[in-house]
Amino acid sequence: DEAIRCTGTKDCYIPCRYITGCFNSRCINKSCKCYGCT
């Protein structure tokens, strides 16, 4: 599983939406954490 690099949470919205179908995500330690749909 490739880490998605980020400088801020907004960098994660599009890639996480692509992966999980939802924007719910955060940028932690310069990589994205995708939470999927809640």
Swiss-Prot record:
Q: What Pfam families does this protein map onto?
A: Toxin_2 (PF00451)
Q: Name one GO molecular function term.
A: toxin activity
Give the UniProt entry's GO cellular component terms: extracellular region
Q: Which cysteines are joined by disulfide bonds?
A: 6-27, 12-32, 16-34, 22-37
List the expressing tissues: Expressed by the venom gland.
Q: Does the keyword Disulfide bond apply?
A: yes
Origin: domain of life: Eukaryota
Location(s) in or outside the cell: Secreted
The entry's keywords: Disulfide bond, Secreted, Toxin
Q: Which InterPro entries match?
A: Scorpion_toxin-like_sf, Scorpion_toxinS_K_inh
Q: What additional remark is attached to this entry?
A: Negative results: is inactive on voltage-gated potassium channels.
- Identify its protein family: Belongs to the short scorpion toxin superfamily. Potassium channel inhibitor family. Alpha-KTx 06 subfamily.
Domains: entry comment:
Has the structural arrangement of an alpha-helix connected to a beta-sheet by disulfide bonds (CSalpha/beta).
Protein name as annotated: Potassium channel toxin alpha-KTx 6.5
List the source organism: Pandinus imperator (Emperor scorpion)
